[in-house]
Amino acid sequence: MKLIPVIDLKDGIVVHAKFGHRDDYQPLQSVLSNQPDIYSILNGFLRMHAFDTLYIADLNAITRSGNNTALIHQVLNDFPSITFWIDAGKILPQEFPKNYIPILGSEYIDKHCATYLAQFNHEFILSLDHGVVGERLGATELWREPNYWPKEVIIMTLARVGSSQGVASKELQHFNEAHPNKQFIAAGGVRNMNDIDILKKYNVKAVLLASAFHLGAITAENLKF
């Protein structure tokens, strides 16, 4: 299974995403670095393991309160061998850097989802987002029509992000059984390697995680596989 570290950016610094309450996110405290800047955290991840994929959430762009675009593009330029999955809110199709894969989240995709997603020609990763009380966010049509989905789909449970409450295993099992031709990615709630083993049983292809790394619950030793 592929483990993908997550970096949440707000106002130019890395913050600790927790429970989906974005207004309350605080500067990150991590065993990987004593500074909450993106380069320190990213290099902390790379000291752990030679990750080839990282996820960056631009929280300012997602909440329409500015953006961290220049900083993110500088990071992509400085680490050309790493693929970055970027969630920058509702974006328009454009020419992205070669190591940039856009994440399109259901929370900001409305009833015109077919027209919007078609513009990307399946060159994106979809995030099916569950809200802070577990509700499905975004257009109902998007959740019901897998033909709109690309090959890779994130099952994002915002209420579990940063919570150390464990993964939404039943939801992931449902999606894997209902849509065996898709590759599902777990996001939210991973506590330790035991949760990773649970996800493997459900044939989850990858997992996004941050807190387990920053708390030292998953270490470099665990990643020697």
Show where each model-derived region lies:
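Short catalytic helix/loop segments, enriched in acidic residues and glycine
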Residues: 21-43
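Conserved anion-binding
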Residues: 7-29, 96-162
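Glycine-rich phosphate-binding active-site loops on the catalytic face of alpha/beta enzymes
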Residues: 89-93, 98-115, 157-162, 188-223
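Short, small-residue-enriched loops and turns at beta-alpha junctions
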Residues: 60-66, 132-136, 159-165, 215
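Active-site/ligand-binding-proximal alpha/beta "capping" segment
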Residues: 145-185
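Charged helix-capping and loop-helix junction motifs
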Residues: 67-73, 137-144, 165-174, 223-225
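Hydrophobic faces of well-ordered beta-strands that scaffold small-molecule active sites
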Residues: 3-9, 54-56, 82-88, 100-104, ...
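N-terminal active-site wall of soluble small-molecule enzyme domains
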Residues: 45-98
